[in-house]
């Protein structure tokens, strides 16, 4: 019989009602895949993929890309996800998914980029929701697809541990590809741990929509690193923009709508924990760290703005100053240093002829906002060739942070300024900056993990910042649980289940059916002989009031493949165990 007390001793705080692992892959020896044109069926890519022309995933089909897949992109090629279609691209820290140039000597602009289109809201048509879809449809530039709608919670899939390199092909003088273009993308889309590197235009740009992003690294792009327009309303946390020594303009370029600065819905980005690193040696105009203009709203906090040529912040035009006056522009609790040769603010406060602003940007940032500091953040290294953007010992970035909103998106206990604290570098393993990580070893001894594996490169005393993250939450009437991302060095078997408030234990089998556990020998594995694991659960809507009150525990047990559960012992058998709980 199972000892409930013993098993509970291994289960720790987090969230679970039930845990369903939605993507786990068997390692195979994949052949080369060559693609181009229309994808009109559910499709899976793995191994080496050659993108030979523009490739469009049509609705309602899903493109799934397995960990470690490398996509080599020919000139003029690009990947477009239509409205209603999805991309499920989930790598791991050890095996990221990489989109790169097919050239033996890769360079910026070798191919296009990735464009994802959704049914999220925009202000580009002048028609407010609710409205027929044809009235709120926008045609994207450079052939990036149609987008827009009235569903802010639309999902276009998942991008996680993905790298996008050497894109930005220029169609003509007015149209070029961003590394990652998000057009009308809804907030049910998951975008985290994405690097856009050496793009010959913007790194990431939002055209309307409601997408939220986290752990984004934009490096060495020639134009703006982080850009939005057309009524974009979304959130971001842990974002890095790093300019090279030869090109690059702004850290953030933020617009509402060029044609109508008051168009509804008005752009609004809530951004916490950004690190924006410019290069004030580049002989280039328009080198601001943050440029809010054309009536955008912005809440930028707990961020570092360092080393930009023209200014740290430059508020432009009447509509944007009006936002600042009425509290819709917040730039506070930030560290600003070494911009404009140490002056930090340009006296030219507006590019709008005939308009005199009621205050300067400097007055706004340093006086009206009361918690910004003009001090050296003391980062380990801002060298563009060998950066280490974590704050060093004694850094002012380790104190003075505001508390992010407690809205289930933001990591609210990130109590530091910038995208990193002094310990954890989330770029390790999967980016061009972070080197490689060894695969996670198969367990050889009893190991119980609280949130993240101990003695593994993701350990962090703050569990919310650790990756692989083991956490979950209830939002929009759904349960979402994340239980880590790994590539194991050899196959493992994975068991999972829940414990109810009355003490009964249930396991979940390969068909996602639950079974009362009375003897470990009778427990069925959820998956066997697996080397990759990515865990994500989205359950249908439910009525929380219908659940019995008490504490619900969840567990994930990883053992060497072929383990005989009849002889399994928690005191001596090798395993990894993750646990979660929520009390109603």
Task: Please identify what each model-predicted range represents.
Residues 13-25:
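Bacterial N-terminal signal peptides
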Residues 32-66, 74-92, 96-443:
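Extracellular beta-rich repeat passengers
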Residues 442-475, 583:
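Short, compositionally biased P/S/T/A/G/V-rich stretches that sit at domain boundaries
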Residues 467-493:
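Contiguous beta-strand segments within globular domains
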Residues 493-499:
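Beta-strand signatures of extracellular beta-sandwich domains
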Residues 520-540:
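Aromatic sugar-binding surface patches on proteins
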Residues 546-564:
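Internal, hydrophobic beta-strand segments that form the core of beta-sheet-rich folds
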Residues 564-584:
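Short beta-strand elements
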